[in-house]
Structures are given as structure tokens and as C-alpha cells.
């Protein structure tokens, strides 16, 4: 599975029209995997996709017309990534690895969006979702 499909939203009708469908996995991967969490950069030009069982984060560039182009793939350093979360400033991406009971952190390169493992594992039992609170007023 691990297919990523983009759609155009018609605001007037509330309908969706399929634009593109691409695999979130490397072309040579033969095993089973499931795309799960998504994280979109603030400016909308980079999309990250978690792949369960393949235990990776696929990075795509998003074109002006919604085209998705594979850019890079990063190992989550965990098992069964359920979801992804970008920090509010876009400097870090977190992978919530459900079966390995941890959250891993990656720095986001401000130029090309590529990920680098920061190190350390935050132990959390079967993490599934993550949200950031707005700054205190």
C-alpha cells in the first residue's frame, strides 16, 4: 500500500479531484508497508510521510500544481511509525514509533527540508499522536 494521493479541493462544491498518486516507498522495496502519518511544512512545499513496517519517513517536494516528487527517505530509528509532527517553528520533525514505544527527533534542514537524526529516544508507551500548544500569552 503506502500510496500517497493528492487531490484538488473545489471550495464551491466541496468535492475532491484526484491529481497524483505516487508510492511512498523506494522502488526496490518488496515487503508490506502502510503509509500512516503526514506532516506538511509551513510553506507547503515539503511533505513528510511515515511508512509503517518499512520504518521510514519519505520526503516529497510539492509542486505548484500539487505534484509530488520523491526527495529523500530517512529511517525512523524506531518500529511502526504511527504519526509525524513538525515543531511549530518547523525546525524539528518527530516520529511517533508505536511498537518500539518511543518518539525520535530529527532536525529539518532549512534549505532542502532533509532530515537528520538528532539523537536520543523519548520513551512513551505506544505513542500515537502529538500536538503543540500555542505559546503562552
Write out the residue ranges for each language-model feature.
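Short loop/turn segments immediately following beta-strands, especially the blade-tip
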Residues: 7-15, 60-67, 107-114
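Beta-rich, blade/repeat-based domains predominating
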Residues: 24-44, 77-91, 124-136
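Beta-propeller fold detector
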Residues: 16-24, 69-75, 115-123
